[in-house]
Design a protein with these regions (language model features):
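Extracytoplasmic gating/loop element in the C-terminal half of outer-membrane beta-barrel translocons
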Residues: 84, 293-294, 406
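Short, glycine-/polar-rich solvent-exposed loops and beta-turns at beta-strand/coil boundaries
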Residues: 8-12, 140-143, 177-179, 436-441
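Flexible glycine-/small-residue-rich
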Residues: 20-22, 35-37, 117, 320, ...
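Residues embedded in well-ordered regular secondary structure
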Residues: 23-138, 176-179, 195-247, 260-262
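Extracellular/periplasmic, surface-exposed regions of secreted and cell-surface proteins
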Residues: 109, 144-146, 150-159, 164-169, ...
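Flexible, glycine/serine/threonine-rich loop segments and coil->beta-strand junctions
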Residues: 2-16, 23-29
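Soluble periplasmic/extracytoplasmic beta-strand elements of cell-envelope proteins
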Residues: 15-19, 32-34, 162, 446-448
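A surface-exposed, glycine/aromatic-enriched loop/edge motif typical of exported proteins
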Residues: 43-79, 168-226, 339-355, 443-487
Length: 510
């Protein structure tokens, strides 16, 4: 095999197509089931300061910085009062926030039932699967139902058809992730152990900690959580409960089909179609609550987001492969058409009469309605070809030519031509290398040159006129990259195969 660049850059027009196992021909129908149940638990827990140690290090930090101590820790009398408060409301060590957000023994189960069989000319494989997984972090649950079908049909001696389609429905509950300011796990790591999880049944609250009741509403479920007293983090348990009021659902349909016609033993035509369709729906609700100055929402908010994405690709190729003595000649001609369309509609409103989840509908809001959305479309048409020559599996040469037209660029700059060429010499097959065959089974020297296009820009970006950053430039087209490479590929003796590649490459973007 002789390749020049990644096939998705040079020849392969179908960059995204569903591909799974096919049904078996001439097999009796077989029904199978596999599944599992399990439990997940973090194997390692962070060691956090208890309440007494937290006070000690908090005072030490203030003293070393030449600052006044926090009033609650300034005197031994206050410290004793704080530790008494902690002991009666959270236990002697205080709140271990990591434990409060972790779901020990998170249950998970998966089930899959499949049917596989066929006749002499038709094979079918169909499977139905269900997954239900509780997250290790509370509130991060996941459910999925998937249905996959694969079809394999031998229409005649020279004509065959394969097709597959998969449908996946996912439902998720999310937590705030990857945000050092508000993330649930970050908050659990940064919240102090003095603060109890809840504030609705506290006892022996020192007067200098009375701010823990700021904004407290006894009849508001989301107001029962304590605002963190000695850091700017949010109460992670309350945050999880609020985010549980929002649901996220996704639907995916992925399908592909390939019609193959062997015109002659040396000439083959393929027509491939692929699609990738997705839909997503977010039903969001942010309740009204106040825990402290860092953790509050003045109004409850109803949010609904709908988005869709459609991707289609249709590719036609005509391939030629024939041998003449020690010569092997290959050629390929093809065309590919791709289209992507995306749209999104987002709506929100505030001022729902209460925090009842049943009232979390857009029509129930009274203030600050907002609607936004956008469409996005792009397409690409490609023509490509390849010629390869192989003599005695020792001397190999290949040339590719690709012409792409992308709707992302301005008129007059939509099309680009991208040639590439490579050559290789399998010197391990030469007669002067016979003495090495006991330890070197394959060694090849190759060199290549290729021009690679790049359409990784936003659609319509060329229409931008003014901007304040380097990214707001008028884009007539995207840079091309010229790549020159050379290398040696070796494979050790087949009985103890060890392979390696030594290569060098130079790229220039213009």
């Amino acid at each position: 095999e002789l390749s020049i660049c990644n096939s998705s850059k040079q020849i392969c027009g179908s960059r995204s197509r569903s591909s799974t196992k096919s049904g078996s021909l001439e097999n009796k129908a077989q029904v199978s089931y596999d599944g599992y149940i399990g439990w997940q638990t973090p194997w390692k827990r962070p060691h956090m300061l208890n309440a007494a140690d937290y006070i000690t290090y908090k005072n030490l930090a203030a003293d070393n910085a030449g600052q006044e101590r926090v009033a609650a820790f300034a005197t031994q009398e206050n410290i004793d009062a704080v530790l008494n408060f902690v002991n009666k409301n959270s236990g002697p060590n205080g709140t271990y926030w990591w434990k409060e957000i972790i779901n020990d023994g998170a249950f998970m189960h998966n089930h899959n039932i499949s049917v596989n069989g066929g006749t002499k000319n038709i094979g079918i494989l169909s499977s139905l699967a269900y997954t239900d997984q509780d997250g290790i972090v509370k509130g991060s649950n996941y459910k999925r139902i998937s249905w996959r079908n694969n079809f394999n049909m031998k229409i005649s001696k020279r004509v065959s058809l394969t097709a597959n389609v998969g449908i996946i429905d996912e439902k998720r509950q999310l937590i705030d992730e990857n945000n050092p300011a508000t993330g649930t796990v970050f908050s659990a790591m940064g919240a102090d152990p003095i603060t109890p999880v809840f504030r609705n049944n506290l006892v022996d609250v020192p007067i200098f900690l009375s701010q823990i009741y700021n904004g407290y509403e006894p009849n508001n479920l989301y107001s029962q959580y304590s605002g963190i007293l000695f850091s700017n983090k949010r109460n992670p348990v309350g945050q999880i409960q609020r985010m549980r009021q929002s649901t996220y659902e996704y639907l995916y349909v992925k399908a592909g089909a390939n019609l193959e016609i062997k015109l002659f033993d040396f000439l083959k035509f393929n027509s491939r179609f692929g699609m990738d369709i997705s839909r997503s729906l977010t039903d969001g609700f942010q309740p009204k609550y106040t825990l402290n100055a860092n953790d509050y929402a003045n109004e409850n908010t109803v949010i609904q987001d709908n988005s869709r994405s459609n991707y289609f690709v249709w590719e036609q190729t005509l391939s030629y492969d024939q041998s003449f003595g020690k010569f092997k000649i290959g050629a390929l001609l093809g065309t590919s058409a791709e289209e992507t369309s995306v749209s999104s509609v987002n709506a929100s409103i505030q001022g729902v009469i209460n925090n009842d989840k049943d009232m979390a509908i857009l029509n129930a809001g009274t203030t600050n309605p907002a609607v936004s959305g956008y469409p996005y479309d792009n397409s690409m048409l490609s023509f490509f070809g390849r010629v390869s020559l192989d003599y005695d599996s020792k001397y190999l040469i290949a040339a590719n030519l690709r012409r792409d037209g992308s709707s992302k660029f301005a008129d007059g700059h939509k099309w680009g031509t991208f040639p590439s060429v490579s050559a290789a010499w399998r010197f391990s097959s030469e007669s002067f290398m016979e003495s090495t065959h006991n330890w070197l089974s394959d060694a090849k020297l190759r060199i290549s040159y290729g021009l690679i296009g790049n359409q990784n820009i936003s659609g319509g970006g060329y229409a931008s006129t003014y901007g304040s950053t380097i990214y707001d430039r008028y884009s007539f087209g995207s840079p091309n990259t010229a790549s020159i490479g050379a290398g040696i590929i070796t494979v050790g003796h087949l009985k103890a195969s060890v392979s390696g590649t030594v290569s060098t490459a130079s790229e220039q973007t213009y």
